[in-house]
Amino acid sequence: LKNFDNTRVYPNDNNNKWIDHLAKKKYFSFLIDEKYGGIKLSTNELSNLLTKIASVDPALGVVTMVPNSLGPGELLTKYGTEEQKDYYLPKLAYGSMIPCFGLTGPNNGSDATGSIDTGKVVERDGKKMIKVNLNKRYITLAPVANLLGIAFRLEDPDNLLGKSGVTVALVERNHPGLIQNTHHNPMNAGFPNGTIKGEFYID
């Protein structure tokens, strides 16, 4: 941490190198159980560690905090199937997957679910799928993430799945129809921030 320089994190060309370095050092695994390769910390331990990291540079604190609070790691731990945990959690723990959590958009911020994006259950090629329309912005780590937790309001007019309401899905980078190539730089904050957009189908 002593050698950290926030110009290396965002937005210059060394961005990916530094994010990759933090991930490989397991800085993003503090909520993941050891059985999956993580460094499971208590809430107090995590708070103390993030405080120390942020004292070196606030941007570095944000880069480290987001995967260890919002998003796929904790959601998978609490709500994921065993198959999902076995597939995703080791990749998150060892840094081959960098997560972000897409919630906010042009019409929803502090009122996070007020005008949230939508996903509609449809039949496509004989399969039940969800057609998602996304317009997310100000998503921390979006420019560098390769595993995206995306929140949307599920619409199921024909009751194909049996439930509607706000839900979260996991989508990997380069999913057909997903657009993930815009950077924001809010107030020169010094951390990767951007948009998640697109219209696409998920199983």
Predicted regions, residues:
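Short beta-alpha junctions and helix-cap segments that line functional grooves
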Residues: 88, 115, 135-137, 180-185
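Amphipathic, small/basic residue-rich leader segments at the start of a protein or domain
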Residues: 1-67, 80-87, 91, 96, ...
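Active-site-adjacent elements of ketosynthase-type condensing enzymes
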Residues: 108-115
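A structural signal for short hydrophobic beta-strand segments in well-ordered beta-sheet cores
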Residues: 119-121
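Flexible, small-/acidic-enriched active-site or ligand-binding loops
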Residues: 176-201
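FAD-binding core of FAD-dependent oxidoreductases
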Residues: 57-74, 92-108, 135-148
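Short beta-turn/strand-loop junction motif enriched in small, turn-promoting residues
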Residues: 35-37, 106-107, 136-139, 153-158, ...
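A short core secondary-structure module
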Residues: 128-178
